[in-house]
Amino acid sequence: EYVWNLGTRSRPNNVYIYYSRLDVGANRVNLAIIARRMASEVFVINSSSSVLTSRPAIGIRIDDDAFFSIHALSSGGADSLSLIQNIHTFFNTEGRRHINWMAVGDFNRAPGRMQEALDSEPGLRNATLIVAPTEPTHRSGGVLDYAVLHNANQTTQNTTVSASIMFNQMRSQITSDHFPVSFVKKR
């Protein structure tokens, strides 16, 4: 956990940075979460994938909400379903069932393909919801970056969260082939 004061000494504006350096080689696919509040818990959840290069999801909990950063394997996101299954299983235990969770990141598969995979898993079919922007999130023209949510207080999932491309941040994305996505609560 790192603390970064975006304000001044007399008017602090702290943010909390949770960072995992997963790619010690090219340094391209490291994960981070930045929060305005300090996390109550920090999580690392692995994929069940047999692929050695599969990256874990990192997450934080603030009150009854958990947030995860994910970067699935390229060429189809073979480990993305496993990551979601393991996050869901982790929170579907005594003492954690009341926690809502949101996994955000590069799933490396279209939301429709991810939904098909989620629908094929009885425990996930009605327990999760995908929130994706309508515009492409990757230079290839595909939507690969989105969120999978679980609301612990609802049996049928619906959301008040929307996703959109952060067009005002596009110029700073020179080295990335993905575009930044913003998730905001609908009013």
Show the residue positions of the predicted features.
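Active-site regions of metal-assisted phosphoester/phosphodiester hydrolases
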Residues: 26-187
